[in-house]
Amino acid sequence: MSSGGLLLLLGLLTLWAELTPVSGRPGLCELPAETGPCKARIRAFYYNPHSHKCLEFTYGGCKGNANNFKTIDECNRTCVG
């Protein structure tokens, strides 16, 4: 293989490695915190993919999304590992 072909192959492998997810974290952990439209004030936890931590938020009690955990331990087990 020519040196140009090897460089192209190396570049493609590098791009593939950069775009392939590293963790086995479930997709729900990538969702934003969603309070929902209801007015209850329920203490809940969500995974913040930018800080790589589970954080507290106030859940309204309805709708929202799956990135919503009753305890920080449950959030950590699911999303942090």
Swiss-Prot record:
Intrachain disulfide bonds: 29-79, 38-62, 54-75
Quote the tissue specificity entry: Expressed by the venom gland.
Listed CDD domains: Kunitz_textilinin-like
Where is the protein situated, by its record's location annotation?
Answer: Secreted
What is the name of the protein in this document?
Protease inhibitor 1
Q: Where is the signal peptide?
A: 1-24
Keyword annotations for this protein? Disulfide bond, Protease inhibitor, Secreted, Serine protease inhibitor, Signal, Toxin
Matching InterPro entries = Kunitz_BPTI, Kunitz_BPTI_sf, Prtase_inh_Kunz-CS, TFPI/VKTCI-like
Q: Which taxonomic lineage does the organism of this UniProt entry have?
A: Eukaryota, Metazoa, Chordata, Craniata, Vertebrata
The entry lists its GO molecular-function terms as: serine-type endopeptidase inhibitor activity; toxin activity
Tell me which residues make up the BPTI/Kunitz inhibitor domain. Answer: 29-79
Taking the first listed entry, what is the main subcellular location of this protein, grouped into a coarse class? secreted
